[in-house]
Amino acid sequence: MELRQLKSFIKVAELLNFSAASKALCITQSTLSQQIQQLEQELDVQLLQRNSHSVSLTESGEELLPLAHQTLYDAGVCKSRMNDLKALLAGTLNIGATHTFSSILTETLLDFMKLYPKVKLNIHYKSMEELMDMLKKNKVDLVLAFKPSRRYEGVESHILFNNHLAAIVNNHHPLAKNETVTLSEIGKYDIALPAKGLQARNAFEQVISHYSPQFRVRLELNEVHILLKLIKQSDLVTILSEATIHDEHGVKAIPIDAPESGMEGCVHLLKNNYRKRSALEFIRLLSESNAIRERIRDWLTE
C-alpha cells in the first residue's frame, strides 16, 4: 500500500468524480484509476461503486476513509519530526486566516520567508467555519482568527492580542473626531456591513442583540478590501475590528462603546497534535511583529 494510492482514494472520495480528482492531483485519469484498482486489489475489497453517471463509496470505502486520512497525517508528522530533529526548518507550513488578518500578517510573512527560505508557505483566507473544518481535517497547521463566539470540539485557542469591534470611517467623516462611538450614533449614518458569516459581522450582531437601534444598512460585502475602498471614497460607515485597518491610510477605527465589543485575536490549534517547529516559529514572529507588539503567551514556550 502506497501513500499516493491513499491520497488518490481520498481525493476521489472527496469529489466523487474521477475526472475532477485527476485534475486536482495533476495526474491522468487512467493513472488515477490504476492506483485505485491496485489499492482495491491489495486490500481485496471494493472501495468505490462506479457507474457511467456517478461514483460513491462502498461500506468498505466508508470504513477506509478516516483510516486513510489518519495514515497520511501520521506520515506528515513523521516527516516534520525528522526535519525538526535535524534542526533544519524545511517542508511546508499551511496557515489558515480570516480576511481581516491579511494586513496583520504581511510583516511576519516577509520576515519568515527571509529567515526560513526552505519552508514553503501556503496561506488560505477563508471564513471561520471553513478554516475550523480545514484545521480538524489537518489541511492547515494553524488558524489565525478572532476568538469565536462558540467552542469548537478538539480545538484550543490562544490569545495573541486584544482588540475591539469598531466603526470604520474615512478621515473626513463627522465621526472621525470621536474617540469612541455609540450604537445610536452609528444609526445616524448609512452603513456598509461585512457579509454574514464573517467574524466582524458575527461580533456586531452579538453586540446589537441586546439593543433595538435601527441601522441604515445600504450594502453588504464579503470582501474586506473592497469594503475599505468604499469607505475611503464615501461617507459610509462599516463595522470591522480595529486590527483590520493596520497600515491602511485614509481611514480611522473608532471603538464601539458597548458591552461585548471586545475581539481577541487568537491562534487556533488542534488539541494533543504534534506542532511543527515551523508553526511555532511563525507564531513567535507574529507575536513579536509591529502589527501586534503584545506579550508572548506562556504556552508558546512550554
Go through the PLM ranges and name each one:
Residues 10-28:
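Short helix-boundary/capping micro-motifs
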Residues 30, 34, 80, 86-116, ...:
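N-terminal winged-helix
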Residues 42-43, 64-86:
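Alpha-helical linker/hinge and terminal dimerization helices associated
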Residues 154-191:
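Flexible hinge/capping segments at coil-to-helix
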Residues 190-211, 275-283, 289-301:
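Secondary-structure junction motif
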